[in-house]
């Protein structure tokens, strides 16, 4: 048997800082079948199991039984299994939304066995992600309005959570995207279909590989919402070989599916982009490492995230805050905004992501009441309310507890009195800022910069990255001519002539100002 050496590994991050390509470009022609076989072999080399004979829905369901029995250390009789499938796993009334909700929120079912004992049956182990069994199958055939045969399916505990559609190199990747759409209409969502559990689609033509969420929302269901995987410096990972070695690492894929995705209250599945995951991971890593080193309440125990406007900072900050609340040693997580309207807006957005995960307040007294609650909810507040609380309440129990602060738009409004009070009152805090416009020494009006207040930059995704990824609109620049008689003076090189003439004759001439203002 061949020896395979690790080519991508990180104990902290799934979005890698470094990745070394260790394969040669094939000299010969590669058919779609060759591409598929090579892809599956690469997955097997990475620890995926490749069971034979799983080519029908009945075989798929039988495999789910084997995997769930192993995961839960339980044995179903044939009658019990039939009842479990019909009443919960694959209820006839379940649609794609109900199945997805089971993956995200309702993944534990209290099942009553025939002898009367009750056991929690887990679909997925979210605490110990490595316990989930990952398998790869190919060419499964399923009938709906038409019979379809799917290229490659990734099973987690037997459930089809990822569907991969491949086209040979040179074929437009949109063809794979269109094929996935056709399957969604024709057979994925047919009655009694475990494919309603699908979370993520991956499409590739060998040279370009992308992933996207399985959603029925029409406004989220276009090619524009497909994403490349990337390294931490936002270098795109496109080739299927590289994509397989990074995105399809078992730990990475399971974390994307089970940790870095959100099924919101409007039944829209959001799968995070690489830069959002990278930022979230680095915040959590910083909190952990600062706690272990006891370097809380210092610049070393914090940092800032430079993500451009429109890149989805709200989802990133929510995930960072939500996962921080799950750390055993963290008592409270604050999300701090600088305007009252943003306070309400963020509350609504966070409640959309997860209805029971957040506490808001409409006053300083309300904020104090929320601090007294013994729950792990995120507290959303304005900097003004937080500052008023710190000024009016010099001695609160929260001041001595382990607290994470995440500041939205960490610009100059957070550099003043509130920062001083925070550092004076809170004894064990970790603070992080999100910004689209960081303040550096060369554009600082005062002594403070973003780094001097929050700590070093932990991750960046700037406007040029977003334009390249087509996640924000390009700049539109118009060069407009004003009246020609005023143009000559603007190119005058003689400073004496220019200073004498510019005000009266050209730049402040009423006709010129009128031309510009009326444009």
Regions found by a protein language model. Give the residues of each.
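ATP-dependent helicase/translocase motor core
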Residues: 2-332, 341, 345-357, 374-377, ...
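Short, conserved "post-DEAD/DEAH" coupling segment immediately C-terminal to helicase motif II
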Residues: 183-185, 413-430
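Interdomain helical connector at the RecA1-RecA2 junction of SF1/SF2 helicase-like NTPases
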Residues: 444-519
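Conserved helicase motor
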Residues: 337-340, 360-369, 383-388
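Conserved nucleotide-binding/hydrolysis micro-motifs of P-loop NTPases
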Residues: 168-171, 207-210, 340-342, 384-387, ...
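Conserved RecA-like ASCE ATPase "motif II neighborhood" in helicase/translocase motors
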Residues: 378-421
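Conserved motor-coupling elements within RecA-like helicase/translocase cores
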Residues: 352, 365-379, 396-397
